[in-house]
Regions:
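Aromatic/hydrophobic pocket-lining residues that form the small-molecule binding cavity
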Residues: 138, 181, 185, 266-273, ...
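N-terminal structural segment of carbohydrate-active enzymes
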Residues: 1-198, 213
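Aromatic- and acidic-residue-enriched segments that line the glycan-binding/catalytic groove
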Residues: 92-108, 164-176, 205-248, 334-347
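Active-site-adjacent "subsite" loops/lids of carbohydrate-active enzymes
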Residues: 213-283, 293-294
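Active-site-proximal helices and loops of the catalytic beta/alpha 8
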Residues: 189-198, 206-207, 212-223, 286, ...
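A generic secondary-structure signal
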Residues: 141-144, 191, 275-279, 307-311
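Short acidic catalytic loops
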Residues: 83, 149-158, 172, 198-205, ...
């Protein structure tokens, strides 16, 4: 036979209230079986099944989510489709690629062309070979995507950048002209709305490219970048140990200088009422996917969530925020702190 036991937890009493007046948190617990001769503890490896043993083992985990701001209902009601813009489809609209010594190299063979690869791991690679996919092409394919049941379209980064992948952002306030620029994004959003398809953008807010308006290592932009002068308005957006060539970068990759979100001006540029996050929500996107979200601070995520949700109050669809978090986002510890991505007020997924 089997013994069946039921356990009721009063989560309100368990959680208490945090500083914001919410009941949420991550809790660890074990069940004890007390017998005449000994006490056994549960040991759960997967948070579902368990074995009994004399020592503590691994605890069950209980994530209590603040229900005051739930995940948008529309998210998850259809297929989510990811598009890597340069390799999806060439559209008929106008485009303009960067030229010059650091400009784009076009690959004419869409079906069989092979982009350059580094000979050895760690070798530098330009990543400036383009196959010609653009936002016009994405818009032209919406009828096909709708027939597949797609209701959410998640795009790879579209902001102006040197590379084909655009994870080295050059200007957060400009859609890359090689992808069709502002006109192509507006056309895509307008058509997607008619098809009932939500569009999510990829936000790379942990770092920029070194070839950016803000760092401007190569003098591509008219602004004085942090690399060019210690008097640059963007100097404190980055962390230099020895200006100009020693600075914090994403995983030590020098072409991706890391942004200093401890600087209020830098952080507000993304998270403020008129910041990047809110600006594009008001323009018509349905949400953001945050690149390397586990490297963004709690302050950044809290403020970004608040500004994006507030901007969404003006639109018909509540915006969603998705984060790239390696390992288990419900219980992850990053940079010495237990993170609260999924407890409410930061990430929806």
């Amino acid at each position: 036979g089997q013994d069946i036991c039921e356990l009721e937890l009063d989560t309100a009493a368990l959680c208490g209230l945090d500083a914001g007046g919410r009941r949420s948190g991550l809790f660890f617990y074990r069940l004890l079986l007390v017998r005449d001769q000994d006490t056994l503890f549960t040991d759960s490896r997967n948070n579902v099944d368990f074995t009994l043993g004399a020592d503590g083992g691994q605890a069950f985990r209980l994530l209590v989510y603040d229900g005051g701001d739930p995940v948008p209902e529309w998210f998850g009601q259809g297929v989510l489709y990811h598009v890597f813009v340069d390799r999806f489809r060439r559209g008929a609209g106008a485009v303009r690629y960067q030229t010059g010594a650091r400009g784009a190299v076009m690959e004419p063979d869409w079906a069989h062309g092979i982009p350059p690869f580094a000979e050895r791991q760690g070798d530098s690679l330009a990543n400036n070979t383009f196959f010609g996919g653009n936002l016009w092409g994405v818009a032209e394919a919406l009828d096909y995507l709708a027939d597949l049941g797609v209701r959410v379209l998640y795009l790879s980064p579209i902001f102006r950048a040197y590379s084909n992948h655009k994870y080295d952002t050059g200007d957060y306030l400009a859609v890359d002209e090689g992808f069709g620029g502002e006109a192509a994004l507006d056309a895509l959003l307008d058509k997607a709305k008619r098809y009932g398809i939500a569009v999510i953008l990829d936000g790379v807010f942990n770092h920029t490219g070194d070839d950016s308006r803000y760092f401007n290592r190569y003098g591509t932009y008219p602004d004085t970048g942090a690399y060019q002068s210690p008097d640059s308005p963007y100097r404190d957006w980055y962390e230099f140990s020895e200006w100009p060539d020693r600075y914090a970068s994403w995983w030590g990759i020098p072409i991706l200088p890391k942004l200093n979100h401890k600087n209020d001006v830098c952080r507000s540029f993304f998270t403020g009422v008129d910041g990047v996050g809110a600006r594009y929500i008001r323009r018509g996107i349905a949400g953001w996917r945050l690149d390397v979200a586990d490297e963004l601070s709690d302050d950044f995520l809290d403020e970004f969530h608040a500004s994006v949700r507030a901007a969404g109050e003006e639109s018909a669809r509540k915006p969603v925020i998705i984060g790239e978090v390696w390992e288990n986002a419900a219980e992850k510890t990053a940079y010495g702190r237990r993170r609260r991505y999924l407890q409410g007020g930061q990430l929806d997924s």
